[in-house]
Curated annotation (Swiss-Prot):
Keywords: Cytoplasm, Fatty acid biosynthesis, Fatty acid metabolism, Isomerase, Lipid biosynthesis, Lipid metabolism, Lyase. It catalyses: a (3R)-hydroxyacyl-[ACP] = a (2E)-enoyl-[ACP] + H2O; (3R)-hydroxydecanoyl-[ACP] = (2E)-decenoyl-[ACP] + H2O; (2E)-decenoyl-[ACP] = (3Z)-decenoyl-[ACP]. Its main location: cytoplasm. InterPro entries: FabA (IPR010083), FabA_FabZ (IPR013114), HotDog_dom_sf (IPR029069). GO terms for biological process: unsaturated fatty acid biosynthetic process. The gene is fabA. Pathway: Lipid metabolism; fatty acid biosynthesis. The keyword Oxidoreductase does not apply. It comes from Pseudomonas entomophila (strain L48). Homodimer. This is 3-hydroxydecanoyl-[acyl-carrier-protein] dehydratase. The active site is at H70.
């Protein structure tokens, strides 16, 4: 059976409700924290490390919630939302791989911001390159990622770590 390799906004909303990978498994956050409109490509192969990759997009418009409050008179998408989107996508990759449990961001290595997303932008693109997937007592993915706006790279993150846990009671 061939795995689905692209996901629409409706697919991602289903994932936020726990309907895509099953109850108790990886979910994306619901809007407003869902920072992705579509996944245009997901694969277990390819990427910079040959272990998998994701490409996803967010459509930008001036009415997005964060522009009204960050910052008044100087609207810009918070950089932490781009970082969170990359964690969301690494967690999605684990669910797509069929690994059980709820996703939790576990950290990252170096993060760099060298650009910004303004209300005049059209599209943010996320590129995730899977470095390693651990399967066993701990199910976790490690990835590098980047965020581009209208084709220009503006953030990078190395060593993004996300795990999936069948119980988060002691987390």
């Amino acid at each position: 059976m061939t795995k689905q390799n692209a996901f629409t906004r409706e697919d991602l909303l289903r994932c936020s409700r726990g309907e895509l990978f099953g109850p108790g498994n990886a979910q994306l956050p619901a809007p407003n924290m869902l920072m992705v409109d579509r996944i245009t490509h997901i694969s277990e192969e390819g990427g910079k490390f040959g272990k998998g990759e994701l490409v996803a997009e967010l459509d930008i418009n001036p009415d997005l919630w964060f522009f009204a409050c960050h910052f008044e008179g100087d609207p810009v998408m918070p950089g932490c939302l781009g970082l969170d989107a990359m964690w969301q996508l690494v967690g999605f990759f684990l669910g797509w791989q069929g690994l059980p449990g709820r996703g939790r961001a576990l950290g990252s290595g170096e993060v760099k911001f060298f650009g910004q997303v303004l209300p005049s932008a059209k599209k943010v693109t996320y590129n995730i390159h899977i470095k390693r997937v651990l399967k066993g007592k701990l199910n976790m993915a490690i990835a590098d990622g980047s965020v581009s706006v209208d084709g220009r790279e503006i953030y990078t993150a190395e060593g993004l770590r996300v795990g999936v846990f069948t119980s988060t009671d002691n987390f």
